C-alpha cells in the first residue's frame, strides 16, 4: 500500500510541472507580444513625428505675425507743434509687435531661465522635462518655449495625449525651419502678461510706462514672472507676490550665469516704480492728467479719435469702394 501511494504522488507531480511550464510559456508569449506591439507603435509614432518635423512648414511665423491683432496709434501735433501720441486703439488683444533686436538680452534670458533653461540646447522638445512631467518626477511643466508657441495658434488648452503629440510635432517642425531668435521673438510678442497685454511691449508700457528697449534687469525679471499666473503676479495688483517670484527669476539667471553676482544684487535691491506708483513720472510727450482736467481732456481726445477714424474709413471707402 505504501508503495502504491508513493507511485500515485509521483504521477500527480508531473501534470503540475507541465501546467506550470505552460503558464510560464503563456506569460512569456504575452510579454513578447506586448513588447513587440509597443515597439511597433513606438516606431510608427516616432516615424510620423520625424516625418512631420522635417516636412513642410506647419506654422508660418510670418503669416502668424500678420494675423495677430495689433494696436493702432493716433497722433496729433500739440501746442508746441510736436507730434505726440493721442490714443492707442486695439480690440480684445492689446499688442505692439517688437523685433528681437529691440528687446534687451536680459529680458530674453529672464524668460529662458524661468521658463525653459535648456532652450538654446534642445531642438524644440526638452525630453528630460517631458519625461519628468509625465512621470511626476518634475514639479514644473514639460512644455518648452517652442512648444508653448506651437500651442498658441490652435488655442487648444485641452490636456490629452493626442494634443501633446501634435504640440511636440509642431515644436520640432518649428525648430527645423526657424532660428531660436525668431522663435523667441514670436513667443515674446504673443504671450499674455495680464491687464489685456499680449507681448512684452504693451506690458512694458502698461507696467512701467516705457519702451521695452529701456527696461533694466530688475524690470525684465518683473515682466518674465507674470506669464505663470497673470493675475497673481500682476505687479500693479500684487506687487509683493511679483517681487518674490522676481527674485527667484534673478536667482535662476545667476545660477545659469546669465548675470553676475553684482548684477543680481543690484537688481534685487532696485526700487521698482510702476505706472500706479506714487513716484511715477510719465515719459516725455505724455501728461499725467489731474482730477480736474481728466474728464475734459478725455472728451476732447474721444472727439478727435472718432473724427480720425471716420475720416480714415471714408478715405478707404473712396479708394477701394
Predicted regions and their residues:
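Juxtamembrane regions of bacterial inner-membrane/periplasmic proteins
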Residues: 2-321
Amino acid at each position: 500500500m505504501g508503495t502504491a501511494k508513493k507511485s500515485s504522488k509521483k504521477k500527480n507531480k508531473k501534470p503540475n510541472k507541465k501546467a506550470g511550464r505552460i503558464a510560464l510559456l503563456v506569460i512569456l508569449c504575452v510579454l513578447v507580444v506586448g513588447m513587440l506591439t509597443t515597439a511597433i507603435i513606438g516606431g510608427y509614432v516616432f516615424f510620423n513625428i520625424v516625418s512631420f518635423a522635417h516636412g513642410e512648414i506647419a506654422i508660418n511665423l510670418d503669416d502668424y505675425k500678420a494675423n495677430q491683432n495689433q494696436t493702432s496709434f493716433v497722433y496729433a501735433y500739440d501746442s508746441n507743434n510736436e507730434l505726440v501720441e493721442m490714443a492707442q486703439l486695439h480690440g480684445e488683444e492689446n499688442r505692439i509687435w517688437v523685433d528681437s533686436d529691440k528687446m534687451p538680452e536680459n529680458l530674453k534670458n529672464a524668460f529662458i531661465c524661468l521658463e525653459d533653461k535648456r532652450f538654446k540646447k534642445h531642438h524644440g522638445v526638452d525630453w528630460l522635462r517631458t519625461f519628468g512631467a509625465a512621470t511626476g518626477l518634475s514639479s514644473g511643466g514639460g512644455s518648452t518655449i517652442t512648444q508653448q508657441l506651437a500651442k498658441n495658434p490652435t488655442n487648444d488648452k485641452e490636456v490629452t495625449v493626442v494634443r501633446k503629440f501634435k504640440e511636440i510635432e509642431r515644436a520640432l517642425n518649428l525648430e527645423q525651419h526657424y532660428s531660436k531668435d525668431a522663435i523667441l521673438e514670436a513667443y515674446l510678442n504673443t504671450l499674455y502678461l495680464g491687464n489685456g497685454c499680449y507681448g512684452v511691449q504693451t506690458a512694458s508700457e502698461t507696467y512701467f510706462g516705457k519702451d521695452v528697449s529701456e527696461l533694466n534687469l530688475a524690470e525684465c525679471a518683473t515682466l518674465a514672472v507674470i506669464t505663470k499666473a497673470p493675475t497673481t503676479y500682476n505687479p500693479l495688483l500684487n506687487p509683493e507676490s511679483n517681487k518674490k517670484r522676481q527674485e527667484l527669476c534673478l536667482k535662476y539667471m545667476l545660477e545659469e550665469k546669465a548675470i553676475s553676482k553684482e548684477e543680481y544684487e543690484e537688481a534685487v535691491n532696485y526700487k521698482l516704480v510702476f505706472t500706479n506708483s506714487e513716484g511715477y513720472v510719465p515719459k516725455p510727450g505724455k501728461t499725467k492728467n489731474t482730477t480736474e482736467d481728466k474728464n475734459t481732456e478725455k472728451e476732447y481726445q474721444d472727439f478727435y479719435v472718432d473724427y480720425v477714424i471716420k475720416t480714415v474709413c471714408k478715405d478707404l471707402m473712396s479708394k477701394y469702394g
